C-alpha cells in the first residue's frame, strides 16, 4: 500500500550519504522543504527587503517633496506673473488714457493755433485794407490838391497881369527893407 500513496520523497534519489540537499523539482517538493525555503527567504531577505522598501519610501517622499516645492514655486511664479500682468494692464491703461489726453491737448492746441492764425490773417487783411484805403484817400487828396492848385494857378494866370505883378514886387521890396531896418 505504500506504493499507492506516492509520496514525493524518494529514498533512492536522495543525496549521497553524509550530506544534506534540497529537492529542486517543484512537483516533488514537500511542505517541509517549502517551509525551509520560505523561512530562509524571510530571514535572509528581510533586511534587504526592508532596505529596499525604506529606500523606495525615501525616494517617493523626496519626489513628493520636490513636486510640492516645484508646485509652490510655480504657484508663486504664477502669482508674480499675474501681479505683473495686472501692473502691465494698469500701465497700459495709463498710457492709453495719457495718449488720449495728449491727443486731445494737441488737437485743442492745433485748433487754437488755427484760430490764432485765422485771427492774424484777418487782422492782416483788415490792416492791408485800411492801409490801401488810406493810400487811396491820400492819392485822392493829392490829386484834388493838385487839381485845385492847377485851377488856382490858371485863375491866377488869368487874373495876374503886369500891374498886379508890379505891385506885388513893390510890396515885397518894401517888406524886405523894413526887415533890414529892424535888424540893424
UniProtKB/Swiss-Prot annotation:
Annotated TM spans: 29-49
Keywords of this entry? ATP synthesis, CF(0), Chloroplast, Hydrogen ion transport, Ion transport, Membrane, Plastid, Thylakoid, Transmembrane, Transmembrane helix, Transport
Report the main location listed first in the record: plastid
Localization (cell): Plastid, Chloroplast thylakoid membrane
Membrane topology category: Single-pass membrane protein
Xref: InterPro entries: ATP_synth_b/b'su_bac/chlpt
Quote a single Gene Ontology cellular component term: proton-transporting ATP synthase complex
Give GO terms: molecular function aspect only.
proton-transporting ATP synthase activity, rotational mechanism
Q: Which PANTHER family match?
A: ATP SYNTHASE SUBUNIT B, CHLOROPLASTIC (PTHR34264:SF3)
Print the miscellaneous field.
Answer: In plastids the F-type ATPase is also known as CF(1)CF(0).
- Record NCBIfam families: PRK07352.1
Q: What does this protein do?
A: F(1)F(0) ATP synthase produces ATP from ADP in the presence of a proton or sodium gradient. F-type ATPases consist of two structural domains, F(1) containing the extramembraneous catalytic core and F(0) containing the membrane proton channel, linked together by a central stalk and a peripheral stalk. During catalysis, ATP synthesis in the catalytic domain of F(1) is coupled via a rotary mechanism of the central stalk subunits to proton translocation.
What quaternary structure, including any partners, is listed in this protein's UniProt entry? F-type ATPases have 2 components, F(1) - the catalytic core - and F(0) - the membrane proton channel. F(1) has five subunits: alpha(3), beta(3), gamma(1), delta(1), epsilon(1). F(0) has four main subunits: a(1), b(1), b'(1) and c(10-14). The alpha and beta chains form an alternating ring which encloses part of the gamma chain. F(1) is attached to F(0) by a central stalk formed by the gamma and epsilon chains, while a peripheral stalk is formed by the delta, b and b' chains.
Family, according to the entry, reads as follows: Belongs to the ATPase B chain family.
**Protein name stated in the entry:** ATP synthase subunit b, chloroplastic
Q: What taxonomic classification does the UniProt entry list for its organism?
A: Eukaryota, Viridiplantae, Streptophyta, Embryophyta, Tracheophyta
Amino acid at each position: 500500500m505504500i506504493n499507492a500513496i506516492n509520496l514525493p520523497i524518494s529514498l533512492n534519489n536522495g543525496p549521497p550519504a553524509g550530506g544534506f540537499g534540497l529537492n529542486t523539482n517543484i512537483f516533488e517538493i514537500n511542505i517541509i522543504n517549502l517551509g525551509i525555503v520560505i523561512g530562509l527567504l524571510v530571514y535572509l531577505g528581510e533586511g534587504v527587503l526592508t532596505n529596499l522598501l525604506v529606500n523606495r519610501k525615501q525616494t517617493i517622499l523626496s519626489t513628493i517633496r520636490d513636486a510640492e516645492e516645484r508646485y509652490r514655486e510655480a504657484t508663486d511664479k504664477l502669482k508674480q506673473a499675474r501681479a505683473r500682468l495686472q501692473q502691465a494692464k494698469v500701465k497700459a491703461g495709463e498710457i492709453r488714457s495719457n495718449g488720449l489726453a495728449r491727443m486731445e491737448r494737441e488737437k485743442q492746441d492745433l485748433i487754437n493755433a488755427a484760430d490764432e492764425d485765422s485771427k492774424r490773417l484777418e487782422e492782416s487783411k483788415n490792416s492791408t485794407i485800411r492801409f490801401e484805403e488810406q493810400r487811396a484817400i491820400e492819392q485822392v487828396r493829392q490829386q484834388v490838391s493838385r487839381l485845385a492848385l492847377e485851377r488856382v494857378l490858371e485863375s491866377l494866370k488869368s487874373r495876374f497881369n503886369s500891374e498886379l505883378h508890379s505891385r506885388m514886387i513893390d510890396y515885397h521890396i518894401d517888406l524886405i527893407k523894413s526887415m533890414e531896418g529892424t535888424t540893424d
